[in-house]
A protein has these predicted regions:
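Short helix-loop capping/hinge motifs at secondary-structure junctions, enriched
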Residues: 63-72, 118, 145, 230-236
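Hinge/lid segment of periplasmic solute-binding proteins
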Residues: 2-54, 79, 104, 194-206
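Short helix-initiation/N-cap motifs at beta->coil->alpha
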Residues: 75-80, 149-162
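C-terminal lobe and pocket-closing loops
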Residues: 177-186, 190, 194-197, 210-297
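Extracytoplasmic/periplasmic solute-binding protein
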Residues: 41-50, 55, 79-124, 131, ...
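Loop/turn elements at helix/coil->beta-strand transitions in domains of secreted/extracellular proteins
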Residues: 44-45, 87-92, 163-166, 198-203, ...
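Extracytoplasmic "Venus flytrap"/periplasmic binding protein-like
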Residues: 1-30, 62, 66-73, 165-167, ...
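Glycine-centered hinge/linker elements that transmit conformational signals in sensory
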Residues: 82-86, 122-150, 198-203
Length: 297
């Protein structure tokens, strides 16, 4: 993942020249610019971007519409929804509260970015006190709306699937089981674990905004292939080039709901892989294309 790319490049674990050569051969212009820029070491690309996903606010659009609420695109809208939809066995939100789980870091980072808080920049905490305070106060709102205890991805998914919360923050890896395609994690909102009812009532928001950042922000995770300094460079390069070109659709098919193509196409068709990905079946025990399960919007 991205968190290892530059540290491993700095430590000499990655062969930056070899990885950069693969990117150049595949064609820099065929990759999403952001995925390349995040892996830059000087003028070179330290690892080859493979795929990524964007974190989402997953919400019950049917309950929002019934209550006359705006979609949860902002701190303000989420706070209003928490107030309106809490009670009668319904938790207004299920936030991540287990501090030693990476999931909480992901959710908290998304909330901070939404309000324009940069915790990586040197001196940022002191200079962004107002934004940071607003972000933490908002996180307190969604944490207080949640059940007691240490919560992470497991509880948020279970409670959403049971119809006991109108909002959670999750990755798109939830999309196949949400549609009743995975027996080990079925929706329990009704008596049919294979039902697509909950999926049909669910909306997704990727860009969240706080009061100090009107543009908002998304949180994404990108995965990379990396040729190491002690690898058989020729063999490793050949494997990556196959996996990112002729075999790229197969690479994405491992879990299409969470493996969005960061290489959109090739020299023949700039959207070839995006189009192929949209038709890939998702699911474990049953399969269907995402385009059959969810509308484009």
């Amino acid at each position: 993942t991205l968190q290892y790319v530059l540290p491993w490049a700095e430590a000499g674990i990655l062969d930056v020249d070899a990885n950069n050569a693969v990117v150049k051969e595949l064609g820099k212009k065929t990759f999403a610019p952001g995925a390349l820029n995040m892996a830059k070491k000087g003028s070179k690309i330290a690892a080859v971007p493979v795929d990524g996903w964007t974190q989402m606010v997953v919400y019950r659009k049917d309950l929002f519409e019934k209550a006359g609420l705006e979609p949860p695109t902002s701190y303000e809208n989420i706070t209003k929804a928490v107030e309106a939809l809490s009670g009668d066995g319904m938790f207004g939100f299920v936030a991540a509260t287990k501090t030693d789980e990476n999931f909480m870091s992901q959710v908290l980072e998304h909330v901070l970015l939404a309000n324009g808080v940069n915790v990586v920049k040197k001196g940022a905490i002191r200079k962004q006190g107002k934004k940071l305070k607003a972000s933490l106060e908002f996180y307190k709102v969604i944490a207080n709306a949640s059940p007691p205890g240490e919560l992470y991805w497991k509880q948020s998914r279970e409670l959403y699937f049971a119809g006991k919360t109108p909002m959670i923050i999750w990755s798109p890896f939830i999309m196949d089981e949400l549609a009743g395609l995975r027996d080990s994690a079925p929706p329990t909102i009704n008596s049919d674990p294979t039902s697509g009812e909950l999926a049909s009532k669910t909306g997704f928001i990727t860009n969240l905004k706080g009061p100090n950042n009107n543009k908002g922000a998304a949180w994404a995770d990108v995965r990379y292939f990396g040729i190491t300094a002690d690898a058989d460079t020729e063999e490793a390069s050949a494997f990556i080039k196959y996996s990112m070109d002729e075999g790229y659709t197969k690479t994405l098919s491992i879990a299409p709901e969470g493996k969005f193509p960061v290489r959109r196409g090739n020299s023949s068709d700039p959207e070839a892989f995006t189009k192929a990905w949209s038709k890939l079946p998702v699911g474990v025990d049953r399969k269907a294309p995402l385009s059959d399960l969810y509308s484009e919007d």
